Amino acid sequence: MKLSTIFTAFAATIATVAGYETTGSKQTVDILIDYIIKETPELSQNDVANWENGDTVTLQYVVNNNEESEITVVGVTGQFKNPVNNEIVTNLTTGKVGPIAVPPGEAIKFDQKINVDLIPANYELIPYVFIAQDSLIKVIPCRGQLATIVDAAVSFFDPRLIFLELVLLITFAGLIYVGYEIWGKQYFKGVAPVKAKKVSAAKASSPVASGPSTTSATGYDTNWIPESHLKQKKTKKVN
């Protein structure tokens, strides 16, 4: 079975889409375009994709040319719409493709990367493919894809969060230091108790002489020795 036949069967749910020429007139073209989301290929148009801000979503397109003449894929764009009121929320940046020529009865693939950065809400993504045929550029809309977009959860070990924590910690420590230097020192000086000077035990126990002191030949003061004791010593020396 030819590869183009497989892709045609895969896109059988997509009817022949309406192409819009740059002249503003409307016509029907026999070009089938479908895509899958490479990160979640199991999702269909009836499912809701879940994306986080900061994600990069890759759409892989399959273009089947059922026209009688050759077509050329030259670009891709798209829109995020409000699925409730169908209002356009934002347009995707137009990306250049190829150009890639697609002969009659053949099919080609190409990718489009989309950076998700929207207010958390529900959206419908509708891509558009630019096709050149017979000197005209035709814009062919693809099927819509419902998606729920949320903000990415911030990890405690995220380098940006760690840096912010360090900045806050250093700032807080700096404020405490400045506050202590300006007010803290003066406050603690005013409330701190005054320490009494300690007197050594040796100085406290030593007697203070009230009169003149005499020193004996032995080298010590004899004023405090009882007189009877001194007489006994002299008597012993005479004997």
From Swiss-Prot:
Q: What does this protein do?
A: Is probably involved in a pathway contributing to genomic integrity.
This protein's record includes keyword DNA damage: no
Could you say which residues form the signal peptide? Answer: 1-19
Print the keywords alphabetically.
Answer: Endoplasmic reticulum, Membrane, Signal, Transmembrane, Transmembrane helix
Its recorded name reads: Increased recombination centers protein 22-1
Query: Which residues are on the Lumenal side of the membrane?
Result: 20-161
Bilayer disposition of the protein: Single-pass type I membrane protein
| Disordered, as annotated region | 201-222
Q: Name one GO cellular component term.
A: endoplasmic reticulum
Q: Where in the cell is it found?
A: Endoplasmic reticulum membrane
TM stretches of this protein: 162-182
- Per UniProt, the ranges with Low complexity bias are 201-213
Membrane topology (Cytoplasmic): 183-239
**Annotated family:** Belongs to the IRC22 family.
The answer to whether UniProt assigns keyword Membrane to this entry is yes
Do you know which Pfam families this protein is assigned to? TRAP_alpha
Which species is listed as the source? Candida albicans (strain SC5314 / ATCC MYA-2876) (Yeast)
